[in-house]
């Protein structure tokens, strides 16, 4: 850390992705835009190789810590097992886990130096399904891309929302 002009401490922040890159025009890019927009030049990112393993994710975390990161933003549920290891290995580092649940981490409690941010994808899906059915569409489908937990939850919500609207419409 270095001192800013008002004597304020600058915290070094790093962002790591479980898959993909920071210019994917999707989830990773949105996270990087937020972190770099807030931190300016005081942040770094670490991108996995294709088909990264838990060991590869641990290596990225280790590299971020070795580069001086005090806060590491870990993007993606695949970080679960790696966060369990990292939180114990680096108790003075704070971890912000995006789209990671306690179940993904696999511990009885979320580690005290880890903050998990999750989304309620099923609610957005419900609203989309409800709206499209209320708009009079009767032949609906859902193409979610990859069968990952967040997309599956969105799909469940979509079906439930469309069904609720259909029930109301008779």
Regions flagged by a language model, labelled:
Residues 2-170:
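A residue-level marker of the well-folded mature domains of exported/periplasmic proteins
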